[in-house]
Design a protein with these regions (language model features):
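Glycine-rich, flexible N-terminal cofactor/catalytic loop recognition
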Residues: 1-49
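Hydrophobic, Leu/Ile/Phe/Ala-enriched alpha-helical segments that form helix-helix packing faces
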Residues: 15, 75, 79-82, 134, ...
């Protein structure tokens, strides 16, 4: 399974140019105050994540923001379904740098142990709330699956 990070602009370009990759599931982060990208013409495996791009600097802030990330368990199930179906995953957010990078890092760390490399890549600033919530949900899902 390949995990890609993509911005809204690049994703919209792929849809317009009809260059959307086959066997691909999408995790689409968007600000709740905006409309999400419509993937219905190019992809049926999409998980929409309405979540503000807020980073945190303390454990208290993390707990406060994690309450808003109430879809982590469903997202973990979606990710495992894509993994089991041998699909690639595109993690997309507005700029392709924070929420999508945090999600991609969690997926790569969980399945391959390579997600922390995204934290050292200057192209990304992974959202820690997204990373920890997705990673923890994937671990819990794997435990339940056994």
């Amino acid at each position: 399974m390949n995990v890609l990070i993509c911005s809204r602009k690049d994703m919209e370009k792929m849809i317009i140019n009809k260059s959307f990759p086959q066997k691909t599931a999408v995790i689409s982060f968007y600000d709740p105050s905006t409309e999400h990208i419509k993937f219905d013409r190019v992809c049926c495996d999409v998980y929409y994540c309405p979540f503000e791009d807020i980073d945190v600097w303390s454990a208290a802030e993390f707990e406060e923001q994690s309450v808003q990330f109430d879809f982590a368990d469903d997202l973990a199930e979606f990710i495992y379904k894509a993994y089991d179906n041998d699909q690639n995953i595109i993690c997309q957010c507005d700029h392709g740098q924070s929420r999508s990078a945090g999600c991609a890092a969690a997926i790569l760390q969980h399945f391959y142990g390579s997600g922390l490399a995204i934290f050292t890549d200057y192209n990304y600033c992974p959202n820690k709330v997204v990373y920890h919530n997705v990673y923890n949900a994937l671990r819990a899902y794997r435990s339940e699956k056994k």
